[in-house]
Amino acid sequence: NKIIDKYSNIKHWYLCGHSMGGAMASSYVSKNKDKVDGLILLGSYIYGDVSAQDTLTIYGSLNTSVKKKIDYKKNIVVIQGGNHANFGNYGYQKGDAKATISRKSQQNQTIKAIDQFIKKD
């Protein structure tokens, strides 16, 4: 809230999180719907009372644990050949499948999807 209050000149806010950061972002948005225009989840899914209409969910096709948790149909982008760790730059993550596309490709596709989602509003 402090950041949003400090930058009151910014009229549209989107919160984004990867993995458990997505859970935290989703939790914040569910309690502060009046302050945020949208939620962007990378390798994560909606937690709490957040509209799928105002949420963009992006996950790699090889990140099957996320797919199992998604019970909504709107604003979902599946990056073919992508995995969980390639949304970040932290290397291999135990239990993650090996991506069949490069980290750069996955991140570029992610940027494009986020840009399109934000511009639609």
Residue ranges and their predicted role:
Residues N9-H12, D34-G38:
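Loop/turn elements at helix/coil->beta-strand transitions in domains of secreted/extracellular proteins
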Residues C16-S26:
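Gly/Ala-rich beta-loop-alpha elbow adjacent to hydrolase catalytic centers
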Residues K94-D121:
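Catalytic active-site module of serine/aspartate enzymes centered on a nucleophile-bearing elbow/loop
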